[in-house]
Amino acid sequence: MAGAAPKTLRFAPLLLLLLLLVLGTSRRAAGAPAASELRCRCLRPVRGLHPKNIQSVAVTAPGPHCHQTEVLATLKDGREACLDPEAPMVQKVLQRMLKGSKAT
């Protein structure tokens, strides 16, 4: 039994190093941005949606995460829908919302 203790002590620094590596890697992964933030959110935009169903609209400009302008509408029932920014109906909805926000 006395011979087993020195073998365990010999591996203690290696186990400590391994533990520190695992903890350091998991902290870095927890602080990293989510993969969904690094790509386009709107893969299949909708060309038409009745404006009465829209509660709010968020516009995301092109950037390193996505090369296209994205229009994300939150509907009154809580769902989200991507709108085609080139569609005439979507442009009218955005203009109305901009006019409404300037009035307040």
UniProtKB/Swiss-Prot annotation:
Q: Which residues form the signal peptide?
A: 1-31
Disulfide bonds, paired cysteine numbers: C40-C66, C42-C82
Keyword tags: Cytokine, Disulfide bond, Growth factor, Inflammatory response, Secreted, Signal
Pfam families in UniProt: IL8
Which organism does this sequence originate in? Cavia porcellus
The family assignment reads: Belongs to the intercrine alpha (chemokine CxC) family.
Tell me which InterPro entries the record gives: Chemokine_b/g/d, Chemokine_CXC, Chemokine_CXC_CS, Chemokine_IL8-like_dom, CXC_Chemokine_domain, Interleukin_8-like_sf
- One GO molecular-function annotation for this sequence? chemokine activity
Q: Which GO terms describe its cellular component?
A: extracellular space
- GO terms of biological process kind: immune response; inflammatory response
Its biological purpose? Has chemotactic activity for neutrophils.
The protein here is known as: Growth-regulated alpha protein
Where does the protein end up? Secreted
